[in-house]
């Protein structure tokens, strides 16, 4: 295990997103490795899928609780199995995060685990897979505009006002015209880009996602979660020239 601990500080920003459904629960987990090559390893893929199944079945309170759960057929915990995987594969491996939802959920994995999405509906939705694909491709931040924090709207408004005032064409525009007529239209574009139900549907841009879902039946979107592999993790930058230079000194 000391060998596994030595690798703990190495950056692991590759890996895969895995999703599993057990009963009426769907869980998604991000498991990171150091290289894309290892992320395609069959043992690594099985490890990620098994953890997603454990999360769906056992409903752990948090990541620490998930790591303390028994890993089936191993004789140890998920954390024990993680350390064993490091020794077997030879790279740092981290279980970074997980999400779990119960009820009528649809899910989607894009590009062999690069992006994963779970969308929960009020009831089973025939359009669920398409909505999950929308979330994967268009990366909305919010479900609808009621979920956008007031400070985000305020910040966006400040940016819009600054952009308008910096445009020479608007040099003589009165303040009230800018705020009452120009800002609202640009805020609508912000909502259309960031709120799932207001986004243009990626298959038919003549309708929003909200209108598409409404046209498909009585199911409505309750919430969604989107993971992208390695997002927010500082990637290791290999400087090949410097590496070669250091070898010949």
Q: Whereabouts are the PLM-identified features?
A:
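N-terminal assembly/interaction segments in proteins that build large macromolecular machines
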Residues: 1-249
């Amino acid at each position: 295990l000391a060998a596994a601990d030595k690798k703990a500080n190495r950056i692991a920003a590759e890996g895969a997103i895995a999703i599993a459904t057990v009963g009426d629960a769907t869980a998604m987990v991000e498991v990171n490795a150091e290289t894309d090559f290892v992320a395609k390893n069959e043992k690594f893929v099985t490890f990620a899928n098994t953890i997603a199944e454990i999360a769906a079945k056992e409903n752990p309170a948090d990541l620490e609780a998930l790591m303390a759960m028994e890993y089936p057929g191993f004789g140890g915990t998920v954390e024990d199995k993680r350390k064993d995987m490091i020794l077997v594969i030879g790279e740092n491996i981290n279980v970074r995060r997980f999400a779990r939802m119960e009820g009528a959920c649809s899910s989607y994995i894009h590009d062999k685990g690069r992006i994963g999405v779970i969308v929960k509906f009020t009831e089973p939705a025939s359009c669920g897979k398409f909505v999950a694909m929308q979330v994967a491709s268009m990366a909305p931040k919010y479900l609808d505009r009621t979920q956008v924090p007031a400070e985000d709207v305020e910040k966006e408004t400040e940016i819009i006002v600054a952009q308008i005032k910096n445009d020479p064409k608007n040099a003589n525009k009165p303040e009230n015209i800018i705020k009452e007529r120009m800002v609202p239209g640009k805020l609508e574009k912000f909502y259309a880009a960031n709120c799932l139900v207001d986004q243009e549907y990626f298959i038919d841009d003549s309708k929003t996602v909200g209108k598409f879902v409404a046209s498909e039946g009585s199911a409505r979107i309750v919430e969604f979660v989107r993971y992208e592999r390695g997002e927010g993790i500082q990637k290791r930058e290999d400087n090949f020239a410097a590496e070669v230079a250091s070898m010949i000194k």
